[in-house]
Amino acid sequence: MGTRRKRTPQRQSEAGFLCDRTTEVREMRTAETILNIIQDRGKRKLPLDDVYRQLYNPDMYLRAYARLYKNDGAMTPGMTEETVDDMSTDKIAKIIEAIRYERWKWTPVRRKNIPKRKGGTRPLGMPTWSDKVVQDVIRSILEAYYEPQFSQHSHGFRPKKGCQTALRDIHETWTGTKWFIEGDIKGWYDNLDHHILMNILRENIQDNRFLRLIEGALKAGYCEEWTSHPTLSGTPQGGIVSPILSNIYMDRLDRFVQEILIPEFTQSSKRKMNPTYLR
C-alpha cells in the first residue's frame, strides 16, 4: 500500500485573499477576520482583488447594522419609510442574493437642505436604510484597505482622529513653520469628479464588480421636493461611504504637499531664531 501525503492548509496568496476560493470557506470567517486580512494588504500596498465575494458574508452586514444602530439618524427614512426597525436576517439574505447576482439597485437619496451655523444652507442626502447598510459594508472594506496608506497628518473623517489630534500634530511638528497654504473647497461633496475617483480606485482595486457597485452608488441620483435629479458629480453629504471616498480622493493632495511642495520649499532642517526672542 502507498503512503498518503499529509495535506497542508492553504496559505494566503499574494495575488488574492486565498488560494482556496470556495465560497463556503469565505463565509465562515467573521467580518473582523476579513477586514484584518484586507488591512494587512493595505499596509503592504498589495492590490485588492476578488473583494466582491466578501459582500456575500452575512457577518459583514450584522457588523454594519450594529454600528449604524447607534447612530441618531437610524430612524431617519430616505425615499422609503424603511428604518433600522425593518432590518432582519431575512432582509440581509435578500440583500446578499441581489448583491451576488449583481441585481442590487441603489435608491436615489432624499435630499434636504439644512441650515449652516454661519448662515446659508447645505444639502444633506439621506439614503434608504438598506442602502446605508450596504454602503457601510463597502465603507468598512475601503477603510480597512486605505487607512494604513493615508498620511499621518490627515485628520478629517478618520477613525480616532479629529480636531484634537490635528491640534496636537500642529503643536508637536509645526516648529519654525514659514509658509502655509490656506484654501476652502466650496461645495466639495457636490463637485467630486466621478471619473477621477474611479480611476484612483482602479489603481489598487482589481475587482470590476466591486468597482461597479461603488460607481452605481455615486450615480444613484437624488430626489428633492419629489423631483428626481441625476448625479453627474459629487457624492451625497450624509452618505455612509462619502467620507472615505473623499479621503481617498484628497490623499493625492496630501501626497503632493508632503512629497513635492514641502521638500521643494524647505531650504534647511533648522530655522534661525527670530531676533525678537533674543532680546
Regions found by a protein language model. Give the residues of each.
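Short acidic (Asp/Glu) and glycine-rich catalytic loops that position anionic groups and cofactors
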Residues: 44-45, 71-77, 116-117, 145-150, ...
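Reverse-transcriptase-like RNA-dependent polymerase core
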Residues: 97-120, 129, 133-141, 168-175, ...
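Conserved polymerase palm-domain catalytic core
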Residues: 152-153, 158-161, 165-279
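Non-catalytic, polymerase-adjacent accessory regions of viral genome-replication enzymes
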Residues: 1-93
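Duplex nucleic acid-engaging cores and interfaces of nucleic-acid transaction enzymes
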Residues: 29, 44-47, 125-139, 147-150, ...
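Residues immediately flanking
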Residues: 79, 140, 183-185
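Generic recognition of stable, solvent-exposed alpha-helical segments in well-folded globular domains
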Residues: 26-33, 46, 50, 59-63, ...
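Hydrophobic recognition helices of helix-based DNA-binding modules
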Residues: 141, 145-146, 257
